[in-house]
Amino acid sequence: MEFLWAPLLGLCCSLAAADRHIVFWNSSNPKFREEDYTVHVQLNDYLDIICPHYEDDSVADAAMERYTLYMVEHQEYVTCEPQSKDQVRWKCNQPSAKHGPEKLSEKFQRFTPFTLGKEFKEGHSYYYISKPIYHQETQCLKLKVTVNGKITHSPHAHANPQEKRLQADDPEVQVLHSIGHSAAPRLFPLVWAVLLLPLLLLQTQ
């Protein structure tokens, strides 16, 4: 039964470690005015796209922002022009939905069991652009997502210089000697005596 807990524990740990990165996809988001709006993620993180939403009637329906989002290659990202309808990723087309703004999510996973799912690799960048539906839009909304590699730190990279001055014979310093020695616990002389006593008694009989 205990073997069943291992995959469940691993799944829980991976879910707990995943981050969610939120992007509000509308023309009023100042981040889209940056030249290279980039979000950095790790594998198994999520990207949440929040679509435009209007809670009152102050904006005419024809003026409400609606977008078709595409996942494209770098050159199409630069020109902000998709090449195929097959590149359509999502549609933000319910700006006045009663349940609130639409949320579209992408999981950056190495493998996916779904036919329409996307697979991502560490060290690669992925590109999203949008084209307006109905309304006129002069600004190109586009996003670059980079999947970072695993962060590794050298054990001595951030060592405290003060720690290097500590001497091994300092009574307040506990030094663990692990290099060149067995990891098995050492047996004290009294323990050896207890273990050898039965052998000594057998020899005397």
Curated annotation (Swiss-Prot):
Pfam families: Ephrin
Residue ranges listed under propeptide: 183-205
Signal peptide extent: 1-17
A single BP term in Gene Ontology: mitral valve morphogenesis
GO molecular function, one term: ephrin receptor binding
Function: Cell surface GPI-bound ligand for Eph receptors, a family of receptor tyrosine kinases which are crucial for migration, repulsion and adhesion during neuronal, vascular and epithelial development. Binds promiscuously Eph receptors residing on adjacent cells, leading to contact-dependent bidirectional signaling into neighboring cells. Plays an important role in angiogenesis and tumor neovascularization. The recruitment of VAV2, VAV3 and PI3-kinase p85 subunit by phosphorylated EPHA2 is critical for EFNA1-induced RAC1 GTPase activation and vascular endothelial cell migration and assembly.
Subunit structure: Monomer. Homodimer. Forms heterodimers with EPHA2. Binds to the receptor tyrosine kinases EPHA2, EPHA3, EPHA4, EPHA5, EPHA6 and EPHA7. Also binds with low affinity to EPHA1.
UniProt record similarity statement: Belongs to the ephrin family.
Name by which UniProt lists this protein: Ephrin-A1
